Amino acid sequence: MSLTGCLPPRPPCSMRRRTSGGGASVSPVVVMASTAGVGGIGNPTPRGKKPFAPWREVPPQVTHTLPPEKKEVFDSLEGWAADTILPYLKPVEESWQPQDHLPDPRSPSFGDEVAALRERAAGLPDDHLVCLVGDMVTEEALPTYQTMLNTMDGGVRDETGAGGSAWAVWTRAWAAEENRHGDLMNKYLYLTGRVDMRQVEKTIQYLIGSGMDPRTENDPYMGFIYTTFQERATSISHGNTARHAGRHGDAALARVCGTVAADEKRHEAAYAAIVAKLFEVDPDYTVRAFARMMRRKVAMPARLMYDGADDRLFARFAAVAQRLGVYTAADYAGIIEFLVARWGVPGLAAGLSGEGRRAQDFVCSLGPRFRRMEERAQEAAKRAPPAAAAPFSWIHGRQVQL
């Protein structure tokens, strides 16, 4: 899971309690950044003095909104998940490993292979390196994402750390597959000699220490919608990075990014299947959860990215990705439209309450609305002066146009 962010500016979420939804509470924990728009650098709050705290703060977050009776839904789907979702995982012995894509240190030609890798990587522009590093850093924050899945209510979390439920097995095995992504990209970038690995490693440590808040309220309906969206977005991002690498003459890097993108696509299919099943068995609550998730907008998992100096690092990384077409506001709109169609939201009829029908209308309107916003933003960008450049510590402080 990795992503840049490209959403229109959104004011901070205020503290609020729900009057429906099974004992919602407001958490005092400060864990994530407010949304920053692509094309701008954001407006971050200065870093506080607390050690290991996120570098900018947000209001307290709503937690535990899932009605207690909804646990029965996931209990009833345990067998279905074992039969339908676990087969999306690949056996370890049949899975690719990072070493399959890297020079073999046991080989007498190891030095020559590394030299060839470095020669290919020498042609990668700095802005492409920024996107590659940003994606890799996000992949390396995997402990945060597994933790996030295990905060969900409804009986889907891994209660013991080695639980035997299909939901627990999926979470651990999914994380094990995802773990290879950051490993591979990290080692590849190290071998290129093009980036400041100490700065990259600091960024990873800061990001894992800061955590994230996907605004899913510990609700697995919202959580699985969020993960479906993120996996699809990640597949798009890595796929576009692969195409950029190929155009700049690094076919090996293109294969690396393409391999990661294929994994993300498979994981997307699994999470999308879970949500499709929820639409089948509980359409009213599921469409309302979809609308709640989209009203908050999908907060990107690396939004608290920080390298120890640049308070605007994530916004700048996202701006570069938008400019290069690695992940854009148009992609965000396209994902909404795809998921609305994938889950048959326009055709929902039976079983919807008045609130459910309003949620249906809202969700179905989002894709076209975001596309219109993106078109206006593109027109404004054409009339605007060239974007400023900013230094990135990942590439030894060199300037990259935003």
From Swiss-Prot:
Binding site for Fe cation 1: 139, 178, 181, 264
Transit peptide: 1-32
CDD domains from the UniProt entry: Acyl_ACP_Desat
Binding site for Fe cation 2: 178, 231, 264, 267
Cofactor: Fe(2+)
GO cellular component: chloroplast stroma
Subcellular location: Plastid, Chloroplast
One GO-annotated biological process of the protein: fatty acid biosynthetic process
Protein name per its UniProtKB record: Acyl-[acyl-carrier-protein] desaturase 3, chloroplastic
